[in-house]
Every structure is written in C-alpha cells, then in structure tokens.
Amino acid sequence: MKQVMKKAFWKKTAVFLMTAGLAACPVLAADSQAKETSARPSMQVLVGGAEEREELGATELDSLSEITDPAEAVVSGESQTEAAMSAAEAPAEQIPDGMVKSSLTGEYVPAEIGNRRPVAFMIDNVKDADPPSGISQADLYIECEVETDLSRICAVFEQYDDVAKIGPLRSCRDYFISLAAGLDEIYCHYGQSAYALPYLESDDVDNLSGLMSYPYNAFFRDGPHAAPHNAYTSGEQINELIRTLGYRTDHEADFTPQYTFRAVGDEDTLPGGQDAAYVDLGYPFNHPCFEYSGETGLYSRYQHGSAHVDTENGEQLAVKNIILEYQSGVTYQDTHYLHYHTWNSGKGKYITNGKAVDITWSRESFYSPVVYKTADGQPLKINTGKTWIAVIRKDQLKDCRIGTDSENTSCVADAETVAAEEEKIKKWSAWYKEIEESYLSKMAQIRNDNVAKHGGKTKVEVGLP
C-alpha cells in the first residue's frame, strides 16, 4: 500500500523533475519514472580493459556494485558476516532494563527510540545557509563534497520528535543515499539531482522530499536566509508525514547496526596513535576543521572561519569521533555532478580522544552497510558518542591535515602515498569514463523496455508496488 502511494506521488511531479534536473542526463531523461522489473538483462562493461558480463539488479540499480575499481586493491578479506560474528563473540554488555544501545552512538537509549528507524536530513552547508537549525541534536553526521567543491551534510537523528526546526534542507545526491543506506534510515531532502532519482524511486529507499505533492505538507520556508537556503521541517511534521505515507517506523527484527561500539564507559584512547588535537578536512570552500578539548573529550567544529553553531540553541557542533573515508570521485560526463564509488574499499582514519589511527572501509554494494576495520584487519570498535564521517577525495588528500594545532599539522598521508593515490584516481577516472556511456545507455534501455511492457506507461502510472 505504501509503495503504491509513494509511486503515485512521483507521477504528480513528473513534469517538474523532467524540467528541473534530467537535462543533465539525456540518456535517463527518456523516461525518468520507469522502474526496473524482476528481469535481469546483462550488459557489457570494461573493467581495467577486459570485458566482463555484469547483471543489472532489479531494484538495486547497482550494476557497478560487483566491479572492482582497478585503482584500489581490496583491503579486507573478511566478509561482513564474519565481522559480525567476531563482534558477537565479545562478552555481552550489561544493558539497563528498558534500554538498548543506540545504533548511531552506542549509548543507552529507551527501547522505543533505539528500535525506531532514524531520519537522515540533507542539510545545506554553504555560507549563505549558516547558521543551521536543530542539527546540534543529531546523533551522526556524514559530510561529503558535492559539485563545485561545496560540501553538504547528512544529519542523522534518532531522537527528533521535539526538534522544532531542522534545516536548511537541500537536495539529495546519489552517493549520500549509499553512504547512509546501512542505517535503515528514512531519507529526508528537498529535491535531488537527476542521478539520484532512480535510487529514490526504487523500493530500497523510503524518502521524504520537499518538492513532492504530498497530502500533508511537512515543509516550510522561514528566515533568516533567502531561498533556496530557507527550507525547513520539524520533528512533529516529519512524524506526521511518515505516518501519512505509511512507511515502516521500526527496524526489522533482523536489523544489524552497521557500527561496532565499545561498551559504555570503556573508552579507547588509541595509545601510540598520531597526535590529532586538530583536524582540517581540507574542503576548499567551507574550510571545516575540528579542535579537541581534553576537558570535554569532544571535537568542536568550525567552518567559514568561526564556530559552527546551531542557531536554535546556540550550541557549537561537537562529536566524540571523526572517521575519514578516502574515496575516488569523478564527475559524470558533460556535467559538474560528482560520482563516488562508494561500494568499494579503501583507507581512512579513525580519530578520537586527541589521537588518530589508520583504518580501512568497505561496502559490498550500493546499499550495503559500511565495514570499518583497524590496520591489522580487526573490526573497528568506536567509542560511544556522536560521530562525524567525512569523505575525502583522494585527489585532495594533500589538503586534509592532522596535528596538535592549526600551525603544527601534517598531511593525513605522506608525500609518496599522496602521489600514488593521485595516480590511482587518474586511472580510475579514465576507466569510469570508458564504461559510463554504456552503463547509462543500458539503464535507459531497460527503463524504456519496462514502459513498453506496461502498455506505454511507467510503473508509476500503473500503480505497481
């Protein structure tokens, strides 16, 4: 029922979506709303110069999920299942009655909160959108650069009911869907790029868009910013919209949190780690950085040259942990939109308590949970508390710095590693450009075939679940 309702809403805004974004992607513009059926046609792609057969998933829209990036060696041989089993072998933590460990922070929260699906909000992060509203109450943050080197934040809330104003909200990018997919979240945004549309349209994503014609309007515009930096919502309105759309509100019984947390009160001080009292992400426009306080044990955030503050309560954003993921990023052909190969593996940093250590990350597919491991291949156990996850493009590693203060920093990777990673990204970019046209053309063909199969109508128009 919920999916029929959801698909009907997409039909109402077909004209807007076609005119607002799909011009950037001509091969998908032929039919922006048809969705893949259970048939699995295959396509030829080039991987490192060799032809391989890859099948296109019915609802995953995940044709590249099994392709190994030739510029990145697989860094983890242990499967996600094995990692989960290893974590399960640890002594059970004694959790107070009526409480559960939060899947976002590892802290104890009431069961009705911890068992509920979180909501991820896409937050505008340009200077004209500062200061934000409500996001100091988020439990997890995911930051990534979008087009023209601007950054955007995905603020994930477990307890959002009483937050009166959340925003400013901005549009979705496809890689943010992948970065948050393992959280079993409901995804809230205000519009989307053309490349995100097929994923949002799939049954794998429950989303709330400020540009949709819903029976209940959960979004509003308010000061102090001018449009498009003034779109907001509230916890109460989001709850009502979720009920209206009939989305599942609780985690399913087999849900496994994607992060492994240490026991409450058992902190890892990362002995022997690199000094990391100051962390500069190296993003060129908002210049985000974090400073560690030994008194609070938290990293306070700064950007645009001043404290990053929530205007609703005056609180500066602060987190216990910072995780850096080094990823390959290229632009879609003939556009300025970025594409990250999120379903891959790579290196990164785990930063907490004023120290930093090397880690690895991996995702098996576009929608898979992320797996973090220590340098020796063990599951990474994160200190309880809020975490800031930042994706660092490999060609910008030289700008990301860690040290004791803003004057005494070093690049997150040595010069030799930076040079090697920059060479890898060149090879990866060339490889991706080889297969992109074939990939997008095949996706358009499948969508058009589905239209013909349903008598000239899209799945949206015939109301299929």
PLM segments and residue spans:
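Ser/Thr/Gly/Pro-rich low-complexity, disordered linker/stalk segments of secreted
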Residues: 48-91, 417-434, 438-442, 446-450, ...
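Sec-dependent signal peptide cleavage junction
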Residues: 24-41
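Ser/Thr/Pro/Gly-rich low-complexity, intrinsically disordered segments
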Residues: 42-43, 71
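Bacterial N-terminal signal peptides
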Residues: 16-24
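A surface/extracellular/periplasmic glyco- and lipid-processing/surface-interacting theme
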Residues: 67, 77-142, 147-427
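Intrinsically disordered, low-complexity regulatory segments
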Residues: 30, 220-221, 439, 443
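Bacterial Sec-dependent N-terminal signal peptides
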Residues: 1-17
